[in-house]
Amino acid sequence: MGQAEQQKQYTPAEYFALEAQSEVRHEFFEGEVFAMAGASIAHSTIAQNFILKLRPALRGKNCRVQIEAVRLAVEENRHYTYPDVMVSCDPADQRESQQLNLPILIVEVLSPSTEAYDRGLKFNQYKKLPSLRHYLLVSQTTWLVEWYQLTEYGAWAHTALAEANDALAIPELGLAMTLAEVYEEAGVAPMKLNFGAEATGAF
């Protein structure tokens, strides 16, 4: 989460007014407003790689894929975020012009300043979204994608993808993506190479 604004509490209307005139995006939680920090090149490249795979995969499926410029209403008047990537296939979201409400997939690229938030409070809030089936936490320091998938029993199953030949496959979205494709041109080393550098004292 970014830095809280100096004003201690905002109403939802004040938050929307701030977003309409600000060049910086803000997230909102229970009256507090947080400015979002700028993304690194690796962060931005990883998000773009997901978009490049998702757009053709979703063609003809009546789904929308959006980047971090589009707001998500996690809970109206209480919690608004800007996921790095999200996909909604809900008909109600097809009519929205300012925000999405019912995503099936959310991708967050982890940053040092937001990782605890993305793993903790944010994920706990995202779990309340009735449409959400897949939540991806993507490292930007090594090849690691953590995939949380809602099972038919209502539990969230966790899968860690860290090997070069590991692949993310979400058939209902037509998505099949290897780790190499996730990290293409991002300048991020595979986990084994990172471990090797640490073991040899290389930098």
Regions found by a protein language model. Give the residues of each.
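Gly/Pro/Ser/Thr-rich low-complexity, intrinsically disordered segments predominantly at protein N-termini
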Residues: 1-203
